[in-house]
Amino acid sequence: MGDAADPREVRRTFIVPAIKPFDHYDFSRAKIACNLAWLVAKAFGTETVPEELREPFYTDQYDQEHIKPPVVNLLLSAELYCRAGSLILKSDAAKPLLGHDAVIQALAHKGLYVTDQEKLVTERDLHKKPIQMSAHLAMIDTLMMAYTVEMVSIEKVIACAQQYSAFFQATDLPYDIEDAVMYWINKVNEHLKDIMEQEQKSKEHHTAEAPGGQKSPSKWFWKLVPARYRKEQTLLKQLPCIPLVENLLKDGTDGCALAALIHFYCPAVVRLEDICLKETMSLADSLYNLQLIQEFCQEYLNHCCHFSLEDMLYAASSIKSNYLVFMAELFWWFEVVKPSFVQPRVVRPQGAEPAKDMPSVPVLNAAKRNVLDSSSSSDFTSRYTRPQTHSSVSGGIRRSSSMSYVDGFIGTWPKEKRTSVHGVSFDISFDKEDNAQSSTPNRGIIRSVSNEGLNNSRASKHIRKNLSFKPVNGGEEESIEEELHVDPHGDLKSYMPLSTNELNSNENTHHKLPNGALQNRVLLDEFGNQIETPSIEEALQIIHDTEKPPHTARPDQIANGFFLHGQDLSLLNSNIKLSQSSPDNITDPKGALSPITDTTEVDTGIHVPSEDIPETMDEDSSLRDYTVSLDSDMDDASKFLQDYDIRASNPREALSPCPSTISTKSQPGSSASSSSGVKMTSFAEQKFRKLNHTDGKSSGSSSQKTTPEGSELNIPHMVSWAQIPEESGVAQGRDTTQLLASEMVHLRMRLEEKRRAIEAQKKKMEAAFTKQRQKMGRTAFLTVVKKKGDGISPLREEAAGAEDEKVYTDRAKEKESQKMDGQRSKSLADIKESMENPQGKWLKSPSTPVDPEKQWNLTSPSEETLNEGELLEYTKSIEKLNSSLHFLQQEMQRLSLQQEMLMQMREQQSWVISPPQPSPQKQIRDFKPRQAGLSSAAAPFSADSPRPTHPSPQSSTRKSASFSVKNQRTPRPNELKITPLNRTLTPPRSVDSLPRLRRFSPSQVPIQTRSFVCFGDDGEPQKEPKPKEEIKKEPSECKGTLESCDHNPGEKEVKPLESTVSEVLSQPITETVCVTPNEDQLNQPTDPPPKPVFPPTAPKNVNLIEVSLSDLKPPEKADVSVEKFDGESDKEQFDDDQKVCCGFFFKDDQKAENDMAVKRAALLEKRLRREKETQLRKQQLEAEMEHRKEETRRKTEEERQKKEDERARREFIRQEYMRRKQLKLMEDMDTVIKPRPQVAKQKKQRPKSIHRDHIESPKTPIKGPPVSSLSLASLNTGDTESVHSGKRTPRSESVEGFLSPSRCGSRNGEKDWENASTTSSVASGTEYTGPKLYKEPSAKSNKHIIQNALAHCCLAGKVNEGQKKKILEEMEKSDANNFLILFRDSGCQFRSLYTYCPETEEINKLTGIGPKSITKKMIEGLYKYNSDRKQFSHIPAKTLSASVDAITIHSHLWQTKRPVTPKKLLPTKA
């Protein structure tokens, strides 16, 4: 514990305080004390608590503790609740809380329900008198929970932990508040250990290297000692043991972890040397630490610790909520308020200043400092330090009144190599003309306004558990707006110094919300406008917009940043991306997406350039119209968000790593832009990481089990205070899991309903789409072919969607200069069509492959001339629809995955890729990442003509599918320029994720061989004329793209697929019609993904062949079954002959059929391999889930077993006590029957006590009246008056040791009469003695009680001596076992003594004044004598029994006689 010499040490030296032993510790009293102390402190403020309320208990004259009347009155009047509730629940000052009901209602609004033993507490319960304490405790507990949720949220904790922990295990992420608190303590303590390790190493290093370094006295000695001993010596200096906290209460009893935590935050106040950290802690050590903590809290934290030492030491489960609120307050002090003394410890290099001298920097800055330290990249500093300055200049984020956001500004930057649960989006400028504009450094980096979404992107373990952990203040949404967009134009500007042209939407949102732009389901469009996600219903209506690029970005924006899967997605995934690509990505170019991004690999890999977002978008993007209030649709929205987040981090569901734009290759995440010169992470590596990362990658189903299971995950621990009222009952912590069961079922049913609705909708739409496609196929295709010679590059259309292409083509002819704008905007006709046939266009269901071309040429020439205004309008509306659609698609993907898991029939599913993939370009984008490994890897790329490679269908399978949906954007200009690369366009097979790539069984679609449209140009690729700007941009972008392709060695496996498809359809299309069934799709029609966007120049050898896809029957049905993926049921398949689709292919005569066979084989092999991987991943996930469930089960069982053991132990102790008591009684009986005269001499007289069960029967004295005449009381009390007490004996130890239950009871406030009755019945047997030994005494005799009463109460004192003796003699003469004293009235004035026969219930007078006999009707009151107190107490009973010692009769019975009172009578006789 440090040197005693130090003054602080002197202060720390202490004597172990006296504490109550466990056996005497009253748990219920402790709970009441803790709750009241906390409530009073919150109601009045710690400093101003009224004196009489500081200690809620008082002790009465009988040593009984009671709650003080003032406290009781305040509780009954609700004043305390109203005061505290107004503070905690932030109630409107204009409408203060009045009364219990108001507080209960306010809590209910927060989703917290006051329950006492699963029963809702009502105002009546709280008004009851005498006070019903359990109801009040429940009320206080709920207020504490509200306060806890206000102070701490899972998101805040994770954000905080990111500062101190470089690596996250997704399985570790907390799933409720208690877990979050433990997670925080553990992460901080781990970080503290790391710091101490580093300091120790540097110290050793310093001493070893410093020539004239500090010379310890033993330095030379150690030089002489053999190395192995020296090593042991250093080991002895091992770091102190800071235990892991696994059970918040139990592991906190020694104070080690908590004291270490406090030391970390306040190293100058609580030094490590002051803390007792040992492997095995003694009781004294634990008390020392606990005292240290209490001192610290009293001195520095405003007395926030309302526990006694015993409370913290014994840690009863009843005070869990108190402990949580205490920890929440600590978190608030250390991470939010951060007073000057809070200076988190950092590594101090040898000789550096002590921590306490370092400037007080907010933790967030410290976190930033960590990042900076971890990478010396000046680039990072320029990017991140400056933005911070700027944002601070601009006023930083506005603090919302909600404490949830108190954690504030500059999101906590994850430390280097963090497995990003969150990613940071940043700019990687392309070498483009607007590079200069993208001055990234000016961008303000602002912490995510809401921490809500962080956990959503977390791994499946807790995937949705905390989804809706909504801060109790309920102000989530408003606060977000307040912080982020109080005025999209005003405040946003303050966050973003650059004008909107300079920043792409990415920057606006991502930079603003490093921890997750959407965390509260609030999206920002590219201009920072708030867009809230649409509900499912809205999305369903808008489904047709699926393929439209949600926003087309301005080319200039492209230079500034990337989007993951398009603007919407980028927003959605920003939660993940932000942290993901956090500084690490920037500072660690080579691994930008390396292991760091395990959880979010998917996103990381492919950031789609934002250029696709239309410049024309207003700040008032129509997406804004779809705002859904956070509170109103919490269930659905949170689910959506979560799904997004989860998917984003899910390799398969998340948007696949395949970028959707050609430039995907230069992923922002990978910092791949050619200009950046950063080494790109290969997709293969990412894939490998994904496979290894149990968390984010757990297969598609990993993060979302089938709907029911997903919801199960979601609910059990979702203490979502405000989400579902029913659940709020759970507010009291995880212990109330039973309440959640019904909620789980309820939610599961709702999800199931939703799923069915979506499925039905999906099927309808797919059917409609199929028809539409068939109709439009030929026309569209021919139109495209006709126009291909016009010189317009279809690429753009491909990316943006079929419609876009046509518009683009037409416009390109007319206005080359306006090409960019034209490309982004959609033609009116396309839009109309998309609206009329939403299904045909948007939800392209794979049911029938439609030639993308159909859609490309939907617009008529007249439409080409549409003016900008109209196009802009339509673009906006389509984008609006797209945002909704993306949500819906995401939901549908999730549901499909869940369905797959349920069906578990992977082999029977066939995949059909519907042509809807607007253009090969699109596919190319999607697959690029994958194929990058393919031909692109092989082919050298020139900066000018980068050829994006197609990922093989297999590699792209699932991922690309999801990607393509989100990433459909108008291709970038450079994309248009790409030279033909011979490649096969294989559409992604992950049908589920793409509405358009939906799974169909062969039956649904005539089994068609998957046809790959290969556009290849035998001759030199001709470049399409492009607008200058396009040309400028293209080289750099392409370069980036190519680089990324090169870096994806992993994808090279796909090489076999290389086809001669000129991805850049701008080349003449001399393609071989590869009617290649994809391995699995061997017999599946794959819509010719190639969008016939043809380069203006006509392909030299273009043979257009029309192939009836139905003719392409699978060689064997077996192939089809192989295709069936993830157990889609056969029923989904339609009859093979049902539909016949025609595909158009360009055939290259020079291609041999055997090439196709080889490709087919390669595809099949890859497919099988992927299937195996998927299965393996699923199995791993299932095993993990099973293991987790098993753990939970085991813990529950252990808890239950402990309780059982405890119960059994107590029962055993009780039984043992009863047994001993019985034995003792029997021994006493034996003694009575066979008295041993010698015993009396040895026996000590008992002190005052009525517990006769332990008294040996006294022996008859040699002189004086028979023993029976002795008053038992006098015998026991050693009263000097008693006949045989020669001297007053001290209270005998044996008596104290054998306190009978009755004695304990009376101490604890049991009713006196009960105690007395017990003792009298026991005592009668033991004390019976005298001449009549032949008669076995009755166990019910109260003779000795009556003797005691007469001697010490009724006839005490010298005055009554004569009367007393006479009556005692009468008693001895009587054979009766039971006697009754008759009182005059309730004043207990003695009148006479009666005998009572319990069997016959006769009461006859023995001596004194009164009726000869008394009947039941005459009795008015019954009394019991308490020997301890020497007084009678009234028994609230009507029936006379042997346990009664005295009675009164009705007063009218006395009035008739008026006898002289015994006191007058007897003394005269005497």
Swiss-Prot record:
Sites bearing Phosphothreonine, chain numbering: T412, T661, T979, T984, T986
Molecular function per GO: calmodulin binding; microtubule minus-end binding; spectrin binding
Q: In which tissues is it expressed?
A: Present in the soma, axon, and dendritic shaft of hippocampal neurons (at protein level).
Report the main location listed first in the record. cytoplasm
The record, for SMART domains, names: CAMSAP_CKK
Q: Name one Pfam family in it.
A: CAMSAP_CKK
Relate the assembly described in the record: Interacts with CAMSAP3. Interacts with KATNA1 and KATNB1; leading to regulate the length of CAMSAP2-decorated microtubule stretches. Interacts with a complex formed by AKAP9 and PDE4DIP; this interaction, which is PDE4DIP isoform-specific, recruits CAMSAP2 to the Golgi. Interacts with MAPRE1/EB1.
Name of the protein this chain belongs to: Calmodulin-regulated spectrin-associated protein 2
Q: Which organism is it from?
A: Rattus norvegicus
